[in-house]
Amino acid sequence: MKAYSITDIGRRRTMNQDYVYASEQPVGNLKNLLIVADGMGGHNAGDLASRYTVELMVEYITNEKDETRPVSLLSSAIHHANELVMEKARSAKEYEGMGTTIVAATVTDGCLYVANVGDSRLYLIDQGIEQITRDHSIVEEMIRMGEIQRKDAKSHPDRNVITRAVGVHVPVRVDFFDVKLEKGDKLLLCSDGLTNMVEDEDILQLVKKSASLKEAAERLVTEANKNGGKDNISVVLAEYE
């Protein structure tokens, strides 16, 4: 698998509270590891929450020698990070309310394993585009209840309100997904700074028209900024070989 990651402050924010991680090489007992985190909290708390969570996860997975099951490793790493982020949030007033989304993925033996908390997403891109994760957000719950249409979600006043985050509750509730991959399939992990600014179909076309993962990722960021760039924009793009 090959991967490329990029994060951009966008056009409206004064700080980038997103954090990305992409390793094509083994991390502990995982053959590879991809993560996007979108932090929240005042001052620099969101910036710290996303970076700290990813660093804690990578450290945990690197040092865990006994567990080899991908889902268990991702789950344990997120729960471990959740407890330490909560401790950090209690340690100083400026860290109160800190938290982060997480979408993390690994591929082994042709199978994709995904964990998510919050509204950062993973898409599978082949001839089409499919959102694998499900947002933990107010608007997603409203869509499920039939209260609003999906097309209205992006303009809803509560579109940025998430219902789950790392660093807020113990235990954190994590959703897991697994998908069988075909050679050439692409994976897109991203923060809502991309998906609130660029439609899924436009994401698909930009990726398909690009000659490399780097070009595709950079074009996605450019498009999000062109459409307003209202939030930080993070993209991890990978291809299964």
Where are these regions (language model features)?
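PP2C/PPM-type serine/threonine phosphatase catalytic domain
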Residues: 1-241
